[in-house]
Amino acid sequence: CLHVNRAHAQRCLPGMRGIQLTGGLSDNMRWKNGDGFGYHAGIAVSTYTKNAHHWVVGVEYLEKRYGYRDCLYPASQFTGEGGYYLNFLSDRKKTFFAALGLSALAGYETVNWGESLLPDGSRLTDEDNFIYGGALTLELSAYVTDKIVLLVNGRQRVLFGGDCGKFHTQVGVGIRFMIR
């Protein structure tokens, strides 16, 4: 009797690393550029521990646009992130994963790139500030190959110290390239 078994590569082993690129919509989740339009983009390094849990360290840019008299003015946040993601669901072949992450964030917020005077003579009262806080993330990942992982995530950021709101909801997609 001949048995043919399929070999699967080992995935999510302790010490494995990946570089991930993410992006998506923020806050109002509008596709159209206009008042309330927000987006984010980030790059991070993931390092796996036991049970497919992983550490994430990276940077992110978030921009939300506010309308005033037919013009759009950006509020931008540059943040660094350090967090831990707990894998709570995966299939037997280790192709699909679901993880819940908690991260610390710190960075800088700028409103209209530091320009407080608007073209009509009005003055912005919001200022540039250092910001700090955290994020709760739900991440779904699927291995396309042994080295390429597709990501879908939703997260809630809570940031203090800024003038443009404490809560920011994000929905995004990404790709992780396993490098080691």
Where are these regions (language model features)?
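Residues that define the transmembrane beta-barrel architecture of outer-membrane proteins
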Residues: 15-17, 33-41, 72-80, 96, ...
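Extended low-complexity acidic/polar segments
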Residues: 79, 88, 117-153
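Predominantly the C-terminal beta-signal and adjacent terminal strand-loop region
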Residues: 64-65, 134-180
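Short glycine/proline- and aromatic-enriched beta-strand/turn motifs that initiate or cap beta-hairpins
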Residues: 6-58, 64, 172, 176-180
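Extracellular loop and loop/strand-boundary signature of outer-membrane beta-barrel proteins
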Residues: 28-31, 66-73, 120-126, 158-162
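Gram-negative (and chloroplast) outer-membrane scaffold detector with strong preference
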Residues: 44-119, 148, 177-180
